[in-house]
Swiss-Prot record:
It comes from Yarrowia lipolytica (strain CLIB 122 / E 150) (Yeast). Its main location: mitochondrion. One of its GO terms (molecular function) is ATP binding. This is Carbamoyl phosphate synthase arginine-specific small chain. The gene is CPA1. The keyword Protease does not apply. Belongs to the CarA family.
């Protein structure tokens, strides 16, 4: 019996898969729903690669950007609102997407942070799925995935062979892609692909003015952290304030080096695109790390793009990965303890570990592709990770790194000269806005 099962499984794996078969399965899945499937044809094209036809269930627009894939089984609202996906077309490997709908983006937690999203809007410019669920069920859901995409102006295509797309990207490497709705594919339009890597995407997602999020009212004398916003996720801010820290968030190019002495710690956030676009941020960090002896013990923590910017500030280099790491189940080894952690990741660039200066050593390593996942200073309280300890979505194995960082911040504050309070004026801080400023998505650079 087991031999027969194995033989049938082998036959199924070797059977040819066509776009037509996926379109049929899409129609069969959605036909049982309460809403009708869109009859509008759509095309997903990889530059210099295959063309996939399907059905549109999002906004009626043509978009172009970097095609990337995520293997996360859940968490599509969090992924789609993650600013690190700005300018990208997100391919989901999970076969059925949208079955638990989309929660409200207006609900907030006790700190005033968005409860279910990682930013106020969808950040990817398009999504590609095998099956899109038109029937959804969850107690937090207020609309379907398709309705959300239409309202946010995001192109979405279903009924395509996502396994073939991922296989191509994995073997050929990162590629530009385009979603066309209601039009036939025209090979002469291949020159119309837009490369978001040539755009400073951080400028698009960073707050335009400083804003402040206070710790809980019952926290006495809270720590005060300066956050450099390169596209910070809501759950990163929540991970800090829920541990008793007040945070002031600054635009990515803000001269933080001029006011760093007012804070108990510096944090550099995640964000989209090529880290070399953020030259001023790198110079500001380098000034804090190497040119201000009075800040030599100031704790600094960076995540994702923040990790890469810290590495650049230290004199290291970054490289573009073949197809990036975007998943919720990537093993990372802590080189200081020998422990393995399952991590959430979303990045297309990595730090070249061979270029790290002598004062830094590798902190974590990716056990899948051996790429660098973090660095730590040999003497100062400075460390960073390529993965996301805050998850959302994904495991919380490494959330203890926030505790480690805030422990260093507590030590730094305690060691400061007694009787000298250099922290920002509380009245001025309280007058700051309480949320991101000027990051509304009113125009895309990559919509044709």
């Amino acid at each position: 019996m087991f031999k027969n099962i194995a033989r049938l499984a082998s036959m199924a794996r070797s059977a040819p898969r066509t776009t037509a078969s996926f379109q049929t399965r899409f129609m069969a899945t959605t036909a049982s729903g309460t809403a009708s499937a869109s009859a509008t044809p759509a095309t997903f094209t990889l530059q210099n690669g295959p063309v996939f036809t399907g059905r549109s269930f999002g906004a009626n627009r043509v978009v172009s950007g970097e095609a990337v894939f995520s293997t996360g089984m859940v968490g599509y609202p969090e992924s789609m609102t993650d600013p690190s996906y700005r300018g990208q077309i997100l391919v989901f490997t999970q076969p059925l997407i949208g079955n638990y709908g989309v929660p409200s983006g207006k609900e907030t937690d006790p700190f005033g942070l968005i409860k279910y999203f990682e930013s106020p809007h969808i950040q990817c410019i398009g999504i590609v799925v095998a099956d899109a669920a038109l029937k959804y069920s969850h107690w937090t859901a207020v609309e379907s995935l398709g309705e959300w995409c239409k309202r946010e102006g995001v192109a979405a295509i279903s009924g395509v062979d996502t396994r073939a797309i991922v296989t191509y990207l994995r073997e050929q490497g990162s590629s530009l892609g385009r979603i066309t709705v209601g039009e036939e594919y025209d090979a002469e339009e291949d020159a119309a692909f837009v490369d978001p890597g040539e755009i400073n995407l951080v400028r698009r997602v960073s707050t335009k003015q400083p804003f402040h999020v206070s710790a809980a009212a019952d926290v006495e004398n809270p720590l005060h952290i300066a956050v450099i916003d390169c596209g910070v996720k809501e759950n990163i801010l929540r991970s800090l304030v829920s541990r008793g820290a007040s945070i002031t968030v600054f635009p990515y190019e803000y001269p933080i080096n001029d006011i760093a002495h007012h804070f108990d710690g510096i944090f550099i956030s995640n964000g989209p695109g090529d880290p070399t676009h953020c030259q001023q941020t790198v110079l500001n960090l380098r000034d804090i790390m190497y040119e201000k002896p009075e800040l030599s013990e100031l704790p600094i923590f960076g995540i994702c793009l923040g990790h890469q910017l810290l590495a650049l500030a230290a004199g290291a280099k970054t490289v573009k990965l073949k197809y990036g790491n975007r998943a919720h189940n990537i093993p990372a080894l802590d080189l200081t303890t020998g422990q393995c952690h399952i991590t959430s990741q979303n990045h297309g660039y990595a730090v070249d570990v061979n270029t790290l200066p002598a004062e830094f050593k590798p902190y974590f390593i990716n056990l899948n592709d051996q790429s660098n996942e973090g660095m730590i200073h040999t003497e100062k309280p400075i460390f960073s990770t390529q993965f996301h300890p805050e998850a959302k979505g994904g495991p919380l194995d490494t959330s203890i790194l926030f505790d480690k960082y805030l422990g260093q911040v507590h030590q730094y504050r305690a060691a400061r000269k007694s009787g000298v309070d250099t922290r920002p004026n509380k009245l001025l801080v309280d007058l700051l806005p309480k949320q991101r400023i000027g990051v509304e998505i009113d125009a895309w650079d990559y919509v044709q």
